[in-house]
């Protein structure tokens, strides 16, 4: 190619339709607020724990489309969801309440906004004591909504 020439590439129009499989390794979502790992318990409760060996903190993130993810517990098989009151809970089946908009912030932490309640800006969040924070009580700029995806094993 000579200097000054421009090459144009065709846009990909095909869909890959990747299965909801394990194409990524499970992650731990570490919250900046108090140092808790997001946890989905077998009874559907969602909270945080500082115990890195807790099996309920291993989460699989599945991309529905660009920037949209499902978060599923590898231990319980439940999907993280947010109800109409902004309460986080574990759901046995994926639904519109389970879809979150994932965004990488300037500080290199991720935030997750409920897609169903995106116009209200309801984030996944953990309080300083490790309990889940209601969506309406969250807003941009809080440490409670900042999560760092970490590998399950430290090696």
From Swiss-Prot:
The modification N-acetylalanine is found at residue 2. In the nucleus, phosphorylated by PKC/PRKCD. One of its GO terms (biological process) is positive regulation of cell population proliferation. Signal peptide: none annotated. It comes from the Eukaryota. Its main location: secreted. One of its GO terms (molecular function) is fibroblast growth factor receptor binding. It is found in: Secreted; Cytoplasm; Cytoplasm, Cell cortex; Cytoplasm, Cytosol. Residues 127-143 are annotated as: Heparin-binding. Keywords: Acetylation, Angiogenesis, Cytoplasm, Developmental protein, Differentiation, Growth factor, Heparin-binding, Mitogen, Nucleus, Phosphoprotein, Secreted. Residues 2-15 form a propeptide. Belongs to the heparin-binding growth factors family. Monomer. Homodimer. Interacts with FGFR1, FGFR2, FGFR3 and FGFR4. Affinity between fibroblast growth factors (FGFs) and their receptors is increased by heparan sulfate glycosaminoglycans that function as coreceptors. Found in a complex with FGFBP1, FGF1 and FGF2. Interacts with FGFBP1. Part of a Cu(2+)-dependent multiprotein aggregate containing FGF1, S100A13 and SYT1. Interacts with SYT1. Interacts with S100A13. Interacts with LRRC59. Interacts with CSNKA, CSNKB and FIBP. While binding with LRRC59, CSNKA and FIBP seem mutually exclusive, CSNKB and FIBP may cooperatively interact with FGF1. Plays an important role in the regulation of cell survival, cell division, angiogenesis, cell differentiation and cell migration. Functions as a potent mitogen in vitro. Acts as a ligand for FGFR1 and integrins. Binds to FGFR1 in the presence of heparin leading to FGFR1 dimerization and activation via sequential autophosphorylation on tyrosine residues which act as docking sites for interacting proteins, leading to the activation of several signaling cascades. Binds to integrin ITGAV:ITGB3. This is Fibroblast growth factor 1. It comes from Ovis aries (Sheep).
